[in-house]
């Protein structure tokens, strides 16, 4: 049986979460996982946890995302990988794909350009994702990369769900609309719920954390979601206000 090894990265502005999976068809096994934290800041560190083992933490300078990914690869090579050639691919979580992507795609220069161009809509996430993609491209030029977008799952919403009550020109010119976020999470949760319930039907998946969102899913397809033009809109969250009357900041 041929097991593929896939490295999945979630790049933040000063952190990088990673998991290495053994993939056999539709079966996934976490081989190792960890975090590179405080990238570009004093006191940076990298952690690794292999299988059910203890988490091991190493403090070392991590000036850039490229250096962080290099250290992660070195840790994996020293524990669960015999060679970098064992890696079949690298996957990245990207927050904002705008209207360009309704599914995961292979990375090429045009994809990188689009992700970078959408940075104003996800300033904490998209620039970091681009740094991670470029770092992998430099370190592992022959390994294919795939990006999965938080917005992709919500691209099935109809205009009555995603359009704001603004002049149509604002949408046509600036693409101002509801995009949603946490789509990968909503897709997974709605699928798992459907399995447990025994039918797809109507499901309300909730993603609750420092960022939080709720979606409406009918027969496996997203029909509405709480987040909007950016991940700031919607319900009250751990570190974001959610919806606030637009006059409040002007009043203050």
Regions found by a protein language model. Give the residues of each.
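Conserved Class I SAM-dependent methyltransferase catalytic core
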Residues: 133-136, 140-156
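Glycine-rich phosphate-binding loop of actin/hexokinase-like ATP-binding domains
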Residues: 153-252
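Short beta-strand-loop/turn "lid" adjacent to the catalytic site in phosphate-handling enzymes
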Residues: 76-125, 146, 153-161
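Short beta-strand segments
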Residues: 91-93, 146-149, 204-211
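Non-transmembrane, aqueous-exposed alpha-helical and coiled segments at domain scale
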Residues: 84, 127, 131, 140-142, ...
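A gly/proline- and charged-residue-enriched helix-loop-helix capping module
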Residues: 114-132, 136, 174-176, 183-187
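Generic structural signal for well-ordered alpha-helical scaffold segments
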Residues: 73, 77, 133, 137, ...
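N-terminal glycine/serine-rich phosphate-binding loop of ATP-dependent small-molecule kinases
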Residues: 2-98
């Amino acid at each position: 049986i041929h097991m593929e090894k896939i490295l999945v990265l979630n790049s933040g502005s000063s952190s990088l979460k990673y998991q290495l999976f053994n993939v056999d068809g539709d079966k996934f096994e976490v081989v190792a996982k960890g975090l590179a934290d405080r990238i570009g800041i004093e006191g940076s560190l990298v952690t690794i946890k292999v299988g059910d083992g203890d988490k091991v933490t190493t403090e070392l300078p991590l000036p850039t995302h490229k250096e962080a990914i290099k250290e992660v690869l070195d840790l994996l090579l020293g524990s669960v990988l015999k060679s970098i050639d064992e890696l079949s691919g690298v996957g990245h979580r990207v927050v904002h794909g705008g209207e360009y992507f309704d599914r995961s795609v292979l990375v090429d220069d045009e994809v990188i350009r689009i992700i970078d161009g959408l940075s104003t809509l996800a300033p904490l996430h998209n620039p970091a994702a681009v740094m991670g993609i470029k770092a992998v491209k430099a370190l592992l030029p022959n390994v294919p990369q795939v990006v999965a977008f938080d917005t992709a799952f919500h691209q099935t919403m109809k205009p009555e769900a995603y359009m704001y009550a603004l002049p149509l020109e604002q949408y046509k010119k600036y693409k101002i609309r509801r995009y949603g976020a946490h789509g990968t999470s909503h897709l997974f949760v709605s699928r798992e719920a459907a399995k447990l319930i025994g039918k797809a039907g109507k499901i309300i998946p909730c993603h609750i954390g420092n960022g939080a969102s709720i979606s409406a899913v009918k027969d496996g397809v997203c029909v509405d979601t709480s987040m909007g033009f950016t991940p700031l809109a919607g319900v009250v969250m751990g570190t974001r206000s959610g919806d606030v009357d637009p006059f409040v900041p002007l009043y203050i």
